[in-house]
Amino acid sequence: MENETVSELNQTQLQPRAVVALEYQVVTILLVLIICGLGIVGNIMVVLVVMRTKHMRTPTNCYLVSLAVADLMVLVAAGLPNITDSIYGSWVYGYVGCLCITYLQYLGINASSCSITAFTIERYIAICHPIKAQFLCTFSRAKKIIIFVWAFTSLYCMLWFFLLDLNISTYKDAIVISCGYKISRNYYSPIYLMDFGVFYVVPMILATVLYGFIARILFLNPIPSDPKENSKTWKNDSTHQNTNLNVNTSNRCFNSTVSSRKQVTKMLAVVVILFALLWMPYRTLVVVNSFLSSPFQENWFLLFCRICIYLNSAINPVIYNLMSQKFRAAFRKLCNCKQKPTEKPANYSVALNYSVIKESDHFSTELDDITVTDTYLSATKVSFDDTCLASEVSFSQS
């Protein structure tokens, strides 16, 4: 059957080659260059800021790095060959390129879906089951899960090595080489449908259910008590601080923790929603074409589907920058755009030694550093009666 199919695909065609409109080529090249270029830079920055910034190395960010690598793979393996196809009108990467590039395309697509599923489950456990999260949602476990995700998708996508071949079509005015299938559509359509179910329908249903539970906990009910909330209380080892200040600070800290978790959940939910929406045109087209005798292949609609896929892979760094204060600060620092403080440094300093425990959550990505330093310093006034070095230092609270 395979030999018959190859001979049918490679048969000489004496009709003139269909010419793609110039405006279609220009629009394709410009859009793909802009979206893929920005997406590649943005996803590289995500990987760098998490790898180089210690406080950014959290389980959730570990999954976001996996997602960024998968998106990079999609942008490079799917976006850039689209440009050469538009310029030359033929496949220019040879047989090995056909196998490897297609493999990397599907590897990136499926790994991104699995990464989204992984951080959705991690968020659900961290927020809805905080006691279990103490040993389930750890950085080391996140790395193991990511290794499993990439190993599974790498093995699964090897299926495409056995389905692809170069197809040569001879026209009156040219010979066109394309990277396509060496089996008929009746055989590879079920594979598309399986991909649609495993890497789109199931993750989206799971995300809808889990984010429903998360929303109920965060926005409708009080957040479950974290066992660390009871063990990590503010230590009052100095008589310089009164009890009311400690209580108020602890309340502010708890409220900040809840607010941070809500913001992180919103950010990740936006990532999932955009994934569902931007992949919907292509996935729908694949399902519809599986039941049509002649597949629908209108050029402009196919371009729209591709652009949606590239946008999905390029937009996540923008979401992180808009919705995460930590990512925004890390991006600024990476670009050396951090503004210098406008205040002049003090001529001399006074050490204020307070024993403060920082409230943190090792299994979640917090957007704001939770600290009470500013609260304590605002309650402690430091005045300098003279500008000379022998000036007297007085505190309003003794």
Swiss-Prot record:
InterPro entries: GPCR_Rhodpsn, GPCR_Rhodpsn_7TM, TRH_rcpt_1. SMART domains: 7TM_GPCR_Srsx (SM01381). Pfam families: 7tm_1. Receptor for thyrotropin-releasing hormone (TRH). Upon ligand binding, this G-protein-coupled receptor triggers activation of the phosphatidylinositol (IP3)-calcium-protein kinase C (PKC) pathway. PANTHER family: THYROTROPIN-RELEASING HORMONE RECEPTOR. GO terms for cellular component: plasma membrane. Glycans are attached at N3, N10. This is Thyrotropin-releasing hormone receptor. The keyword Cytoplasm does not apply. One of its GO terms (molecular function) is thyrotropin-releasing hormone receptor activity. It is a multi-pass membrane protein. Keywords: Cell membrane, Congenital hypothyroidism, Disease variant, Disulfide bond, G-protein coupled receptor, Glycoprotein, Membrane, Receptor, Transducer, Transmembrane, Transmembrane helix. Belongs to the G-protein coupled receptor 1 family. Residues 1-28, 84-99, 169-193, 289-296 are extracellular. It is found in: Cell membrane. One of its GO terms (biological process) is phospholipase C-activating G protein-coupled receptor signaling pathway. It is linked to Hypothyroidism, congenital, non-goitrous, 7: A form of central hypothyroidism, a disorder characterized by sub-optimal thyroid hormone secretion, due to insufficient stimulation by thyrotropin of an otherwise normal thyroid gland. It may be caused by congenital or acquired disorders of the pituitary gland or hypothalamus. CHNG7 is a congenital, autosomal recessive form characterized by normal-to-low T4 and normal-to-high thyrotropin levels, and reduced or absent pituitary responsiveness to thyrotropin-releasing hormone. The chain crosses the membrane at residues 29-51, 62-83, 100-121, 145-168, 194-215, 267-288, 297-319. Residues 52-61, 122-144, 216-266, 320-398 are cytoplasmic. Disulfide bonds join C98-C179.
